[in-house]
Amino acid sequence: MISDDTDQFNPRDAKSPEIAKGKSAKRREARQMATQALYQRHMAGHALNEIEAQFRVDNDFSNVDGTYFRELLHGVATNQTEIDTALKPCLDLTIEELDPIELAILRLSTFELLKRIDVPYRVVINEGIELAKVYGSTDGHKFVNGVLDKLAPRLREVEVKAHKR
């Protein structure tokens, strides 16, 4: 069972729909917060720890997987060169030409595809699309979907092929 004071998840708990749903909802909130924080970092250029601290003070984290938020935020920053290198072949624009919020979403999703193989690629794509619907431009979700659809087979070839069988 998951307790309120830990972010640990026992796979046996997934049998309980409420627990599994609660975990995924907290992860979705973590992705939303991380997207906003990455956008802020891109626009304002503040230090990562400063942005993280500000988000934790300014926002209610009771429904956020705080550990996952931190992993996403710091993981994207630490692996940004690798992330951008993976993204470039799937883009018709340069990284610099991308809308900053869509860039934040793509970097976050790419990080998950690269480093969080426990998260199914279809979940990563869906979460990226949902983030773009909320925060992106009018058709930003279509753009994000197109890029992630090209990227997933490059980064998760075996998983994508297995799913298509």
Curated annotation (Swiss-Prot):
Q: Which family does it belong to?
A: Belongs to the NusB family.
Q: Tell me the classification of the organism that encodes this protein.
A: Bacteria, Pseudomonadati, Pseudomonadota, Gammaproteobacteria, Pseudomonadales
Q: Which InterPro entries match?
A: NusB-like_sf, NusB_fam, NusB_RsmB_TIM44
Q: Which NCBIfam families does the entry mention? A: nusB
Query: What protein name applies here?
Result: Transcription antitermination protein NusB
For molecular function, the Gene Ontology terms on record are: RNA binding
Keywords, A to Z, come to:
RNA-binding, Transcription, Transcription antitermination, Transcription regulation
UniProt lists compositionally biased (Basic and acidic residues) regions at 10-21
Question: What species was this sequence derived from?
Answer: Pseudomonas syringae pv. syringae (strain B728a)
Return one Gene Ontology term, BP aspect. transcription antitermination
